[in-house]
Amino acid sequence: MDEALRPPRVDVDASSGCRRVDPPRRPVLFINPNSGGGKAARAGLAKRARKRGIEAVVLAEDEDLVSAAREAAAGGADALGMAGGDGSLAAVAATAAAYELPFVCVPAGTRNHFALDLGMDRHDLIGALDAFTDGVERRIDLAEVNGRAFVNNVSLGIYGDAVRRSAYRDAKVRTVLETADEVMRQGAVLPALHLIDDLGHEHHHLAIVLVSNNPYALDYPLARGTRPALDTGHLGILLLDVPGETHRSPGRTWTALRLEMTAAEAVHAGVDGEAMDLSSPLRFVIRPRALRVLISSRHPGMSPSARRLAPPPVRPSRHAS
């Protein structure tokens, strides 16, 4: 694994935002057997979870995940976990937040961006189960668009069109670039996105809109695409204009507590990487510290960008008395 992306072990104290808690007595883990090309099945995740006293629910094809999570919470579960992609994680996380239950992320998807930003070792699928038995708890924000929770981001415009393509799962970057090339050709029709920011300013001619649950770091090559924190209480917003349509800088970023967008029709979107149509107006909000998250005490680390921004450790002088 790239050492630059490996989360370090950090002390559990007030500065880390983590606190030790008693392990849940009736935890339930939902497992999507198809996520990550069958990653959970190959690791024998369900069997190993049950050995730890965790109720493992392997989801059937087309099973209603939200209903299953709500049923578990209403039935007495005192912690909910999800092994799957980030879209599935968001669905169970929203239920956990609604019932004030702790949530466990098990990185069984393809990219596992949420796990990376939590400071987990996103390649340690089995080790993530330790969160249920020897975990530490922290509170993070949860974002919503039109009442639907997301843990990472909502992408509109070029990216929103790209995630709808069948090739996206296997070749994300190439598919986005191909979509961008098609959309940017002269005469191509872009989604008519109209954004009003938190100061009342209007934005038109948008090629890409990215609204994230906390802002992304954009200044560090190795850490780019990760978030330094998940508890700032702010949405991150990134806009890219259609080239040649405006005289200002084509890219803009800022943070806000809420955001509203309108469009003439339903908008193609990628919500935590899952394709869907969102009805206008699109209303984004953030719920500060709404989600309790349990993380294995073996690696309650920081995201790559958080490590880049953290001050160097203070080392005692050799000459100190």
For the regions a protein language model found, what residue spans apply to each?
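Short N-terminal binding/cap micro-motifs at the start of the first secondary-structure element
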Residues: 37-40, 218-219, 293
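Internal helical hairpin/lid segments
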Residues: 201, 206-247
